[in-house]
Each structure stands twice: as structure tokens, then as C-alpha cells.
């Protein structure tokens, strides 16, 4: 291709993504767009086509972003090249959204005609506005009996401030309004800016590992062109490689001669090491490099940490490999080795939130076949010591000696909860119970309220979302962002089994709730830990002080079964012997702890 052809082609490229709250019909709309642009043969079409992971299809959510190239012949007779970059909608995967938006010029904002704007929609809209994207509002599911498109149109204008008078009324399921959406993309989304003759600049927005071809990087070309045989250089690491193949996804990978400005495709360069192709890095030519890298992504810091251990201790190295491969295209995953007396060798892994944690654990069990035990998640606490130093604690068992701690700080989040006004009382009660501080309350219209609370992250992390959904019959939607640290009265609680501390069961709790929580946990463990041949005391302690205790009764073997009547001293001798045996067993016996026991520490509030 010469330069003139490249520039002409560039004018016909439209890069866009679809943003929406969970369940507002994003993946279905993506399916319809693929169908209407005839980019997928009818027989290959299946629901949620872009959600390639089994987990995504089962849970009906999008986890990873995906990019596809489509050709669309518009009403003006021109054929346009669309790049659709699919995004997840769940709060834990916000970083996936910010990654895909950085590769676009426009975004389709999908809002459910029955439910209206939800917390996640707003959060993603702000991300899109930060990236200066052109927003196209679409009101989806208008064929539902409960649909109120006019109310939602007004809501988009009032809450987001977008002109929604031309908003497309659509139903992705019934294939209504899809043509109008495609035409609006052509009209409203600007073509990519960039110079095909400038030095190459390409943003890596995703990467995956293939056993045969090495690392496959998904890239968006900002300036310049790249083709097979080029010598390229990663700007963050300075490593150089030779390009083996460039291509586009039509959802299948298809090699092409070159990728030029505005193209979204993939590149392989026999990169063997997972760490050499970092998401957010800039690729440039080794011989004629760009002067400065593109602005990457802001690093998402993990908020929740938990210990992950293989049940079969021989699989420790396999687990390390699994985590490295997942980290390749999940930049926010962090891990470091740790050991526990109760569980052996494993890793301390950092996640963005609970859903992220669940999904990663499930992916390790499925994709790599490693069975795991996970400890209770905890957040990062900061301790100001009496000698003026600061200690950061991400694992409750590493909490310093309470005598040496002056103050403890814990992370707080600003939680915005959108809810119908019938449930305001229930939401406020839940937030108070979770130690939240009320901030503001705005009425969006006559039925929906946006409530803002500051809540400790440790309270949000466990089961806040589940409780919020159940106390509002599923109507509330919820989004949170970290706002910083605040001082709290926190103590570390240890659980002792048979007089020994189990490090993996320790957790950090607010002093006012310590007694109740200790009591609940001890009772719960009593039912979960199998009975031994000797009596096992279960205790909850803060420092040296035991605050709750119960006993797991022993399984009694009837040693008198073979005595038929007869001499009392004979029976007494057998009972004494049994008692001595049990005492000895108790001093050396160890207690097996089932996986449920670790989870019991989390799910406290169900009582």
C-alpha cells in the first residue's frame, strides 16, 4: 500500500467499544453487530460470540476484552472498517474497560430501557469522557413490557448530560434498530488521527500466550506501519524482536500484509518470555524508534489479598506458572511466595475485588487443573509504630505486636449506591452496620436515589455486594473507588485449635465487634471441624486474652463392650487406660482443617 491509499483507508476506519452496566445487553448487541455486518458465517454464530472463555459464557458476564474487525457497507455506498472492542461491565474489571477505551475513538453507551442508568454505567461513562471519546447513546430492550424509553432518554440527559434526542431505540435480541446504530457509528465516531509515515507507535492493550507461537500481543497502531520481518523494540523493557506475523481478528485470527494507522490487530514475534510483552507498553521500530512512548494505563493496584495454596504441595511450581500466565494479560494481578504452618508453601495473591478473586481461582482450577485452598481475603492496613516508623500489613498473621503499635489505619472507599427510594432505609441500615459514614443523597428522578457512603474497604470486600442485593431485592447497583486511609480501632484476632494458633485463620476486626465475631466463629468452627478421638478446644483470642471458647467433643470408643457384667475394677482399669491414651494423643495429635473452615471466617454476617 502506498501512503495515499493508507490515508484513504484511514478515513474509513471507525474504532469503538460498547459500554454498559452488567446485564444491559452488551454482548447480545455485539453479536447483532457481527451478524449484520456479515462478518461471521451464520453457522458459526452463537450467543455471546466474543466471550470466548467458558467461565464467561457460564456466568453470562464478560471478563476479558476482545477485539474484532468488521466491514460495513453504509448507506452512502462506502465500505467502512469497524473495530469493535468488547469491554466487561463489572466493577472489578474496570481496568479492562479503561484498556479497551484507550484503543478507541468512540463508544456506544447501552442503557436498559426498563432499568435506566445504573452505577456502573456512570463509572464507565466517566472513563470514556476521560479518554475524550464520542458517546452514542442506545436505549436497548425496548421490546420489554416494562420498557420506558422516554423516561430513560430524559434520565440520560439529566444524569449524564448527554443529548439523547437522537438516541437509537433498539432491541438487540429482536434485531431492532441495529442498522441505525451502525449508521450512527459511521457519522459520529471520528476516524483515527495519526501519521502512517511517522515512526511506529503501537499500544499493546492485551496479550495471550500460545505454546507454539509464544506471546501474541493485541495492538492498536497509533502512528506508522508494521509488517512481518520488521525489527521491533518494546519501549518499556528495551527488548528487541523480529515480527513473525501481523494480522487481524475476524473473530478468528487472520494474517495480513501490514497493519497501519488506526488498525487493531495482533502481532507475534517469537517472544518467549511472558514479561517482555507488557500490557500498556509501546511497540516501535528498532531502527527508527519513536521519541517517546504512548501514555500507558494507570496501574490498577490490588485491593484484596489472600493466600492461595495448592492442595497437593508438589504442585507449587505449577501454581507459580499458572499465576505467571494469568498475569500476562491481567496486569493487576500481583503475587509473592509465602509459607504457612497450617498449609505449607503457596502464594500471597493480590486482586481487585472479590469477583476477580473468585474468577482467578476458578481459572487456575479449570485451565491448569490445580486444586486450591484459599485463605480469607484481607486488605492492606498501615500501622504507625510507637517508634515513629510505618509498617504495611497485607496478611493478618504478620500484624506487629499490639504493644508497639501507636495507630492503625485502614483503607476507605467511597461507595455510590443507586436504589429505588423504597429501599433507602434498608441500604442505610446495611451501611451503618458495615461502619459506613453517610455523605450525601441525591434524587435522580422521582423513584431513584443515589446514596454515597464512606465505608471501610474490609467491610465491602467480604459480602457487602451480596447483602446489598438481598436487602434491596436485587434493585440496587453499586460502584466504589478508593479514597484513602483513616484511623480505626482495629485488633488482630487469632483462632487457637488445641491450644495452637492457626496462622491461616487469623483476621483483623474492629474492636467493637471483636467479641461477637469471636463467638460466632468459634461456634461455626465447632460444626465444621471433624470430631477427633480426643477433645479439641477451639478458642478466639486477642493478644493473650481468650474472648470465646468452645470444645469439639471427642468420639468415644466403647472400651467396655467386651466386658460381660462382672468386676468393676476391671472396667475401671480399661477406662483409666483409655483416658491415659487420649491424654497422650491430645498432646501430640494434630487437627485437620477443612477448606470450609477458612471460608467461615468470611461469611460471618449470615447468622
Curated annotation (Swiss-Prot):
This is Elongation factor 4. It comes from Macrococcus caseolyticus (strain JCSC5402) (Macrococcoides caseolyticum). One of its GO terms (biological process) is positive regulation of translation. InterPro entries: EF-4, EFG_II, EFG_III/V, EFG_V-like, EFTu-like_2, G_TR_CS, LepA_C_sf, LepA_CTD. It is a peripheral membrane protein. Pfam families: EFG_C (PF00679), EFG_III (PF14492), GTP_EFTU (PF00009), GTP_EFTU_D2 (PF03144), LepA_C (PF06421). The keyword S-adenosyl-L-methionine does not apply. Keywords: Cell membrane, GTP-binding, Hydrolase, Membrane, Nucleotide-binding, Protein biosynthesis. GTP binds at residues 23-28, 140-143. It comes from the Bacteria. The keyword Endoplasmic reticulum does not apply. Belongs to the TRAFAC class translation factor GTPase superfamily. Classic translation factor GTPase family. LepA subfamily.
Amino acid at each position: 500500500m502506498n501512503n495515499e491509499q493508507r490515508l484513504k483507508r484511514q478515513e474509513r476506519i471507525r474504532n469503538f467499544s460498547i459500554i454498559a452496566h452488567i446485564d444491559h445487553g452488551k454482548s447480545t448487541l455485539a453479536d447483532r453487530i457481527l451478524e449484520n455486518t456479515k462478518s461471521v458465517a451464520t453457522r458459526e454464530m452463537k450467543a455471546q460470540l466474543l466471550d470466548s472463555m467458558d467461565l464467561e459464557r457460564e456466568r453470562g458476564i464478560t471478563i476479558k476484552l476482545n477485539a474484532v474487525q468488521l466491514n460495513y457497507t453504509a448507506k452512502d455506498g462506502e465500505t467502512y472498517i469497524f473495530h469493535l472492542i468488547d469491554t466487561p461491565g463489572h466493577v472489578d474489571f474496570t481496568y479492562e474497560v479503561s484498556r479497551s477505551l484507550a484503543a478507541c475513538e468512540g463508544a456506544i453507551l447501552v442503557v436498559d430501557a426498563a432499568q435506566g442508568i445504573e452505577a456502573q454505567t456512570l463509572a464507565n461513562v466517566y472513563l470514556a469522557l476521560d479518554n475524550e471519546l464520542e458517546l452514542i447513546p442506545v436505549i436497548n430492550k425496548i421490546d420489554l413490557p416494562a420498557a420506558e424509553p422516554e423516561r430513560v432518554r430524559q434520565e440520560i440527559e439529566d444524569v449524564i448530560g448527554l443529548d439523547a434526542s437522537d438516541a437509537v431505540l433498539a432491541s438487540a435480541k429482536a434485531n431492532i434498530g441495529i442498522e441505525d446504530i451502525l449508521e450512527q457509528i459511521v457519522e459520529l465516531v471520528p476516524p483515527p488521527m495519526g501519521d502512517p509515515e511517522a515512526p511506529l507507535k503501537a499500544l499493546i492493550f492485551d496479550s495471550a500466550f500460545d505454546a507454539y507461537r509464544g506471546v501474541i500481543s493485541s495492538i492498536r497502531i497509533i502512528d506508522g506501519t508494521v509488517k512481518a520481518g520488521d525489527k521491533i523494540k518494546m519501549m518499556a523493557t528495551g527488548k528487541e524482536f523480529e515480527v513473525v506475523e501481523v494480522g487481524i481478528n475476524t473473530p478468528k485470527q487472520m494474517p495480513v500484509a501490514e497493519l497501519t494507522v488506526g488498525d487493531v490487530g495482533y502481532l507475534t514475534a517469537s517472544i518467549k518470555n511472558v514479561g517482555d510483552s507488557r500490557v500498556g507498553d509501546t511497540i516501535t521500530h528498532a531502527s527508527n524508534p519513536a521519541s517517546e512512548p504512548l501514555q500507558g494505563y494507570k496501574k490498577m493496584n490490588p485491593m484484596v489479598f489472600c493466600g492461595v495454596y495448592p492442595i497437593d504441595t508438589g504442585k507449587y511450581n505449577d501454581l507459580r506458572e499458572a499465576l505467571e500466565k494469568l498475569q500476562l494479560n491481567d496486569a493487576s494481578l500481583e503475587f509473592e511466595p509465602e509459607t504457612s504452618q497450617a498449609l505449607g508453601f503457596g502464594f500471597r495473591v493480590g486482586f481487585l475485588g472479590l469477583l476477580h478473586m473468585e474468577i482467578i481461582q476458578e481459572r487456575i482450577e479449570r485451565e491448569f487443573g490445580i486444586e486450591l485452598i484459599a485463605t480469607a481475603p484481607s486488605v492492606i492496613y498501615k500501622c504507625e509504630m510507637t517508634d515513629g516508623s510505618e509498617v504495611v500489613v497485607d496478611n493478618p498473621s504478620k500484624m506487629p505486636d499490639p504493644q508497639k503499635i501507636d495507630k492503625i489505619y485502614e483503607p476507605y472507599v467511597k461507595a455510590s449506591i443507586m436504589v429505588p427510594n423504597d429501599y433507602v432505609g434498608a441500604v442505610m441500615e446495611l451501611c451503618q452496620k458495615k461502619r459506613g459514614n453517610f455523605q450525601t443523597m441525591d434524587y435522580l428522578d422521582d423513584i431513584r436515589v443515589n446514596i454515597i457512603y464512606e465505608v471501610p474497604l474490609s467491610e465491602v470486600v467480604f459480602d457487602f455486594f451480596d447483602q446489598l442485593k438481598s436487602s434491596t431485592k436485587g434493585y440496587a447497583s453499586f460502584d466504589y473507588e478508593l479514597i484513602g486511609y483513616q484511623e480505626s480501632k482495629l485488633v488482630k484476632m487469632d483462632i487457637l485449635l488445641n491450644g495452637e494458633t492457626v496462622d491461616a485463620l487469623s483476621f483483623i476486626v474492629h474492636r467493637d465487634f471483636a467479641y461477637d465475631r469471636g463467638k460466632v466463629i468459634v461456634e461455626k468452627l465447632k460444626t465444621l471441624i471433624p470430631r477427633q478421638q480426643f477433645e479439641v478446644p477451639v478458642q478466639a483470642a486477642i493478644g493473650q486474652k481468650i474472648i470465646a471458647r468452645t470444645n469439639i467433643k471427642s468420639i468415644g470408643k466403647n472400651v467396655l463392650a467386651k466386658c460381660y457384667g462382672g468386676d468393676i475394677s476391671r472396667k475401671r482399669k480399661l477406662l483409666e487406660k483409655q483416658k491415659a491414651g487420649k491424654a497422650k494423643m491430645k498432646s501430640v495429635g494434630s487437627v485437620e482443617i477443612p477448606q470450609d473452615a477458612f471460608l467461615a471466617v468470611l461469611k460471618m454476617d449470615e447468622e
